[in-house]
């Protein structure tokens, strides 16, 4: 939700 906003990954 910070970098991978499109993926929305927990990492």
Swiss-Prot record:
Signal peptide feature range: none
GO molecular function: metal ion binding
Predominant localisation class: secreted
Coiled-coil stretches: none
Cellular-component GO terms for this entry: apoplast
Recorded superkingdom: Eukaryota
Keywords associated with the record: Apoplast, Manganese, Metal-binding, Secreted
Localization (cell): Secreted, Extracellular space, Apoplast
Entry similarity comment: Belongs to the germin family.
Subunit structure: Oligomer (believed to be a pentamer but probably hexamer).
Function: May play a role in plant defense. Probably has no oxalate oxidase activity even if the active site is conserved.
Protein name: Germin-like protein 4
């Amino acid at each position: 939700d910070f970098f991978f906003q499109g993926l929305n990954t927990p990492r």
